[in-house]
Amino acid sequence: MLWLGVNIIFIFLIPILICKSFKLSKYKTILLLLIFITCYPSRMTLNYGQQSLFVMFFMMLPFIFFNKVSSIFSGLSYVKYSTGYIVFLNFLASKQYKYFILASIPYFVGWLIYFSVSSSDPLINFFEPIQLSLKKGYIRDADIFSLINIYFVPAKELYFKLLILLIIFIINFILLIKINKNNDTFFKMSLVFICPLIFFPHSNYDYVLLFPILCYSFLDTEYLINKINICFVLYFFYFNRIINHLIDFDTLYQPILLLFLIGLVITNIYSYKNKDNLYFFNLKFY
């Protein structure tokens, strides 16, 4: 019951904090709050007692509060390392090395406490999350890492998994560098949060990470790219699970969703304001 109460607080706090920080109108704030409360990923997080809302809250702190304290607390997102890793990688990609060190404090404190209390080998504990993930074969079917492990026979070998992991991190890092070339913090947060959904295993409740790009798109709904963003996120929030069950063919359905997600990120990057202050996609619906 305690954890349910914490998740309920987060389900209200996250949309209110985002909308207030980036100055969305009261009407849009209420609408987005209702969407976030009623969407399937949020409800699933509450029902199953998952930590997606907890992780998302601490992930977004450095984008909202530009101080050392928020950077330190952002490190708590690493409790779900397949998602929280993006905080650390983004600090490196944006050359915020001081914040990277600060965000590492919670992890190192937890690591010190754990191996001290358990009297276990500190080196083994430090790399244990990655080791367990590789050996136990933690995969899904809607991300690059999982699909490679499913369809490539050599991926069953540990050395191949390590190689793929390294390549994925490099690609993700390059993508983050591209994202961070923009000056709009809200825009950057929206795309950074999508990266874990593209590169590493996740579940349906992790799609709460799409909420920032929905909020960002509500800032200006005149442009085609924002309309596409809104439709895409609402599909994930309300229709994805239903359509998936009706089709019942994950082998094809999940990779297609992944391609759309990748396309969404790339399209948003190149449709952002260019040096002439014009939108690349400025078509409007009348």
Regions found by a protein language model. Give the residues of each.
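Short alpha-helical "patches" and their helix-cap loops
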Residues: 5, 76-79, 103-106, 224-232
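Transmembrane alpha-helices and membrane-interface helical segments
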Residues: 13, 17, 57-67, 87-94, ...
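Primarily membrane-embedded glycan-assembly and transfer machineries that use lipid-linked glycans
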Residues: 1-69, 94-211, 279-280
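Short, surface-exposed, charge-dense and proline/glycine-enriched linear segments
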Residues: 33, 81, 117-118, 135, ...
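Transmembrane-embedded, aromatic-rich helix segments that form part
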Residues: 71-77, 82-93, 104, 208-210
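Aromatic-enriched
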Residues: 218-286
